[in-house]
Structures are given as C-alpha cells and as structure tokens.
Swiss-Prot record:
GO terms for cellular component: nucleus. It comes from Gallus gallus (Chicken). GO terms for molecular function: DNA-binding transcription factor activity, RNA polymerase II-specific; RNA polymerase II cis-regulatory region sequence-specific DNA binding. The gene is HOXA13. It is found in: Nucleus. Belongs to the Abd-B homeobox family. Residues 224-283 bind DNA. Keywords: Developmental protein, DNA-binding, Homeobox, Nucleus, Transcription, Transcription regulation. Binds DNA as a homodimer. This is Homeobox protein Hox-A13.
Length: 290
C-alpha cells in the first residue's frame, strides 16, 4: 500500500500506527521495509521521492525509476491473496494512483505484484487528474473496515490537486436499501438510485388529428370529435327541400343529394337523422305545453 505525505516524520508515524484489516497490511506495518511513494508533480516538488532518513539520496543525483530494498518475506506470503481494505490516515485524503515521473520504493520480491495489480504507473502526469480514482483514504477515523450508514450509499469524489474546476458531489445519496458494490467498479461511474416513483399523468399527444388521449386512462385512446363545420345556406336549403318530400332517405336519393350539395353520403345520412330527432323534440314540447 502506498502513501504520500510531505513530511518524513509523519510518514513514519503513520506507518508505525497503521492497523489494517488484511494480512498484507499487518505484515507491511510490522516489516521494516516501507512501501512509500512520493507525491506527483502537482502534489510535491519535482522528482521528490519518499525515503527513510538513512536512505535519502544526495542532492543533485539522478534518482532511479525504482529503488529496491531488502526482500519482504512476510509481504510476499500475504500479498497475492490479500484484499485492500479502506484505510484511514490522519494527514489527508488521497487516491492510490501515481504517475511514472517519481521514484517508487518497493520490495524486489513478488510483493510488487500487489502494487502492479492496484496501481497504474504507465500514465503521464497530465493524465493523472483525469484518471479514475479507484481507492480512497479517509482522514480522522480510527482503523478498521468502513461501516457506512444504513440506508445510504457513500460515493466519495476524490479531489485532485490541480483540478479546482472539478465539481464536488454530495457524498450521501439516499437509497431504499444499502447495496455494497465491488471496489473495482471505480468511483467515477454515475450512480443510479432506483426508487419507486408514482407515474405522472400521461401527457403524450398523438400526431393523429382524430386520436386524443383519454384523461381517465392513460393507455387507452378514443376517437375524438372533429371540428364541426356548419352547412352553408345552399346546402341547408337543398336538405330541407328533400326532407319535406320524404323524411327517410334512400340510397339513390342520398347519392344525388351528396353530389348536389358537395357533402359526403355520411353527412347527408346524419343530417336526416338529426333532423328527425329535432322534429320529434319540437312535437313533444308542443304536446307538453298544450
């Protein structure tokens, strides 16, 4: 596991007092071989690597890309199958990704496979601020596994130095039930919180002119009434003349009236039906008044 800090004294204090929840972290804390890594260019001075007090390089000397220390047998045994827990340190809240510009002090044994598994050192310094932050460390808490509040999903957004324009999001998103997810999913993915929501009323409008949505049932449709077009005086005169001749219209008569008045046969039929109903209402009204 890699830490960064500006002070060597704070690094030693953090590593001596670190109690992790996995076998690898416990072995790394007890072993004198420290896996330390310096800040990248935006976080510290250029080419500033973390060393113990006895191994600090002389000023002006070129620093190697990887500096090896004595073999760490305890870390070799537990690094292959150890899982990385949440760590809590008292001096910052940093991601576990570093660039290749600075030196890395690691063990020469296969314990470095643990760092290769969880670290990506092939990216440039410019890509550091845009890469996904897969691990985070919280400050001001005691050692132990992270216990989130039930009913909430904790999604911290790791701040990056040099990227002040990056928006910060709320760390607590309400959910119906807490669902832990794997740490390999990354922290940059958008989190969707499913919640039961009442369906809003259906406001979709059909492009068809004769189809409208029913207000009581959003999924059912009924044929709407077309706009009423009043008959002209010439049409009404012809219809009234034919009605006076015969209240019930025949097929041949309907076709002839349709051609004369420039109306459809359906319109002619409906007009005769309405005219008979109207006459019936007038007769019934006269009977009731008399």
């Amino acid at each position: 596991m890699f830490l960064y800090d500006n002070s060597l004294d704070e690094i030693n204090k953090n590593m001596d007092g670190f109690h992790a929840g996995s076998n690898f972290a416990a072995a790394a804390a007890a072993n004198p071989c420290r896996n330390l890594m310096a800040h990248p260019a935006p976080l510290a001075a250029p080419s500033a690597a973390a060393y113990t007090s006895s191994e600090a390089p002389a000023a002006g000397m070129a620093e190697p890309a990887v500096k090896q220390c004595s073999p760490c047998s305890a870390a070799v045994q537990s690094s292959s199958g150890a899982a990385l827990p949440y760590g809590y340190f008292g001096s910052g809240y940093y991601p576990c990704r570093m660039t290749h510009h600075n030196a890395i002090k690691s063990c020469a044994q296969p314990a470095s496979t643990f760092a290769d598994k969880y670290m990506d050192t092939s990216v440039s310094g410019e890509e550091f601020t845009s890469r996904a932050k897969e691990f985070a460390f919280y400050q001001g808490y005691a050692a132990g596994p992270y216990q989130p509040v039930p009913g909430y999903l904790d999604v911290p957004v790791v701040p990056t130095i040099g990227g002040p324009g990056e928006p910060r999001h709320d760390s607590l998103l309400p959910m119906d039930s807490y669902q832990p997810w794997a740490i390999t999913n990354g922290w940059n993915g958008q989190v969707y919180c499913p919640k039961e929501q009442s369906q809003p009323p259906h406001l979709w409008k059909s492009t068809l002119p004769d189809v409208v949505s029913h207000p009581s049932d959003a999924n059912s449709y009924r044929r709407g009434r077309k706009k009423r077009v009043p008959y002209t005086k010439v049409q009404l005169k012809e219809l009234e003349r034919e009605y006076a001749t015969n209240k019930f219209i025949t097929k041949d008569k309907r076709r002839r009236i349709s051609a004369t008045t420039n109306l459809s046969e359906r319109q002619v039929t409906i007009w005769f039906q309405n005219r008979r109903v109207k006459e019936k209402k007038v007769i019934n009204k006269l009977k009731t008044t008399s």
